């Protein structure tokens, strides 16, 4: 049985053994460990994950791929090393899901690029979080997440995307992946991205003050980046009273002319702790 990639599902099937090895190496997988794979497609990555001795839960939206995988991995399914689920991961409530995601777990996947943001939000901002991720994403997205220092200044420029990841874990750019590593090849370069040590411990002080502190945090961050040319403080006046900001800026000793892109993840956490 053979299936062809569906453009509507953003499918690009991995065909590179070298990239596969890079993903498995970055995953640092232990035998018996729980792995969640999203969009297994033809099962190339699934097979490599199973060879490590890991227990894999693979969630596939495409019924054609699901049937192919069910046949291809019949033995692993029977031995319960692989649990194959037909469904849309973005619609699954991981806490009450019928496939009962075992924890702790790692998320390792070649995801459709158009849902990268939604995947990061779902698995970083909500329980149960993976302890780490290894994802194939667009290179441009990986660059933005890691926000590596600019050659001219030696400083990195943060974005909503990079902050959204770094407050939960540590991202690493593992490797650039050319279009030819996929069938069909995408029109852009890709990258293997890992996010290590995922947790919400950075939000401890914020959550102690407000159980919905993570939502409030991102409300503040989004406001801070609302107008790129404006100063951070001016942007925040959209959602916080000027008098409150004046007091917080004074107490924290912040530069009046600082911009959102120059604020580090810890700066944001400290700011919201003072505001909440």
Residues of each region from the PLM?
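Catalytic cores of RNA-modifying enzymes
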Residues: 1-219, 243, 261, 271
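C-terminal lobe and adjacent flexible extensions of AdoMet/dcAdoMet transferase-like proteins
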Residues: 197, 223-276
